[in-house]
């Protein structure tokens, strides 16, 4: 598994991407609940040059992994996956919360700290031979990413990796999505 931020031989380009992220992610303490520090990416989204650098790095990761399809997890994953797919000329698979997609769907459920959640894709979104890169903003506990991985694989796609802006290394996300390759532009 890979993390650009903590790879043994980081390149200057990787360091530059991590620095761009550090300069464009805002900490919001005690949101959405006391004790949580929310990582707000809206400053990144509001800065076209910084956003372009990050999308370029994610697109480079997709190319390196041989992705032929990009899948984005609702909601902030959509903001990253769509421009990556556009830049690469690939299709985009939106992974939505249950009940948000019309027509036949495939679903996968996963446990949350208190309760459960379900995500869905269109039944025909992934095909045999598709090499899918899963894209999201943050890898934390890994529950959503693991469910998305199983959902895409059940549809016939080969999930070639998970690419995220940032990984919260103090949480078990990387272990939960193993053996997927994880490309993290910034490890916190």
Curated annotation (Swiss-Prot):
InterPro entries, A to Z: Ade_phspho_trans, PRibTrfase_dom, PRTase-like, UPRTase/APRTase
Keyword Repeat appears in the UniProt entry: no
GO biological process assignments: adenine salvage; AMP salvage; purine ribonucleoside salvage
Location relative to the cell: Cytoplasm
Reactions catalysed: AMP + diphosphate = 5-phospho-alpha-D-ribose 1-diphosphate + adenine
EC primary class: transferase
Enzyme Commission code: 2.4.2.7
Keywords: Cytoplasm, Glycosyltransferase, Purine salvage, Transferase
Mitochondrion found in the keyword field: no
HAMAP family: Aden_phosphoribosyltr
Protein name: Adenine phosphoribosyltransferase
Record gene name: apt
């Amino acid at each position: 598994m890979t993390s650009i931020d903590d790879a043994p031989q980081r390149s200057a380009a990787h360091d530059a991407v991590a620095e761009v992220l550090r300069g464009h992610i805002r900490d919001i303490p005690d949101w959405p609940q006391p004790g949580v520090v929310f990582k707000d990416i809206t400053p990144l989204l509001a800065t076209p040059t910084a956003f372009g650098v990050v999308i370029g790095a994610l697109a480079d990761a997709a190319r390196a992994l041989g992705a032929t399809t990009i899948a984005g997890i609702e909601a902030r994953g959509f903001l990253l996956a769509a421009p990556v797919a556009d830049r690469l000329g690939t299709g985009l698979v939106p992974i939505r919360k249950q009940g948000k997609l019309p027509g036949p769907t495939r679903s996968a459920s996963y446990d949350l700290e208190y309760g459960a959640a379900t995500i869905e894709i269109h039944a025909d979104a992934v095909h045999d031979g598709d090499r899918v890169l899963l894209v999201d903003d943050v890898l934390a506990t890994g529950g959503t990413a693991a469910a998305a991985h199983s959902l895409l694989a059940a549809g016939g796609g080969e999930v070639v990796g998970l690419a995220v802006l940032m990984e919260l290394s103090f949480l078990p996300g990387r272990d939960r999505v193993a053996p997927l390759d994880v490309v993290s532009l910034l490890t916190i």
